[in-house]
Amino acid sequence: MSEATAATVALGKSWSVYLVRAANGALYCGISDDPLRRFDTHCSGKGARFFHSSPARALVYVEACASKGDALRRERAIKALSKRAKERLLVGVPVLREVGEPAI
């Protein structure tokens, strides 16, 4: 375990994946160890270039993850979802399968 990782574990620093809704209705997905602070950064016009064309309007989803690596993997999975699937995620309906995907 690296010194930085040990310090993170000692401080109880946790990572989350989050979704922010932009003014145009688009959803932005990211990770942070402090989603509320990161949302404030997005709202202030700093942070992701995504919000240059349409400002951040609401932090609509936060999911705690066990590690930064887990948060990155979950972010990638969420970004791969269709807009419709992301919207279902927001209302708590699990995405079991996308249209066109083979049954597992």
Curated annotation (Swiss-Prot):
CDD domains: GIY-YIG_UPF0213. It comes from Pseudomonas paraeruginosa (strain DSM 24068 / PA7) (Pseudomonas aeruginosa (strain PA7)). InterPro entries: GIY-YIG_endonuc (IPR000305), GIY-YIG_endonuc_sf (IPR035901), UPF0213_domain (IPR050190). It comes from the Bacteria. SUPFAM superfamilies: GIY-YIG endonuclease. This is UPF0213 protein PSPA7_1257. Belongs to the UPF0213 family. Residues 13-88 form the GIY-YIG domain. The lineage of its organism: Bacteria, Pseudomonadati, Pseudomonadota, Gammaproteobacteria, Pseudomonadales.
